[in-house]
Amino acid sequence: MKITLIYFDFPFWRAEIARLSLYLGNIEFEDLRITSEEFQRVKANGKLDNGIKIPFHQLPCLVVNQTSIAQTGGIARFCGKLSNLYPINDNLSAAKIDQFIDIATDITVLISSTKAEDREEIFIGELSRKLTILNNSLELNNNYLVSNNISIADIAIWGLMGWITSENIDGIPLNILKYHKNISSICLLVDKHPKINEWIKKTYPANYLRGNF
């Protein structure tokens, strides 16, 4: 099986959830990182310069044996099944994982759709509300979000919070997680995973602040 993950040269959770799933599962894949200039052409014509089709003209995109797959959730579940980070025969656990992917997406859309000058307002309002609800929903007992083993749910929340507290978003305090100890705990647990640390050392910029957990 030939697998290619297409995204920008940046460790954003929407792509890292797939990259890390494959890496943790020791699954060989091409980590294809394109420029913002090429992405402008993707938005216009729905394909890379090399001819690979990009469904919905959006990234990330996963190509499996010349079949292109779009959307973060679908890509994450496919990669998670390959690497045993998403259950194949346990529908309840799968649904529990899905809810964390969906809330991560909701929070991302909330931030990304807000102008920088309005982010202080959403931090005080809707973002704080969502983070409080998420924090209060977690029952960790020193384990990962859904079971004793890491899943794509954990990678999603870790990656999202790493982005929020990485100095890349104006108007949101870097210490936001001090008010949300359960979220902070799961992020710290994921952050200690040996394979994740291997990936960070291999691919992250040397000066990248990946999270203030």
Regions found by a protein language model. Give the residues of each.
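Secretory-pathway/luminal and periplasmic proteins that interact with or process carbohydrate-rich
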Residues: 106-110, 166, 212-213
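Short acidic/histidine-centered micro-motifs embedded in hydrophobic/aromatic stretches
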Residues: 100-103, 158, 202-206
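Residue-level recognition of oxygen-bearing side chains
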Residues: 74, 182, 195
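Alpha-helical packing segments of well-folded alpha/beta enzyme cores
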Residues: 18, 126-130, 134, 160, ...
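GST superfamily/GST-like fold recognition
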Residues: 97, 145-184, 190, 200
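C-terminal helix/juxtamembrane-tail motif
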Residues: 189, 194-213
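GST-like domain detector, emphasizing the conserved glutathione-binding G-site
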Residues: 1-131, 140, 145, 149
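Acidic, Mg2+-coordinating catalytic module of metal-dependent nucleases/exonucleases
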Residues: 137
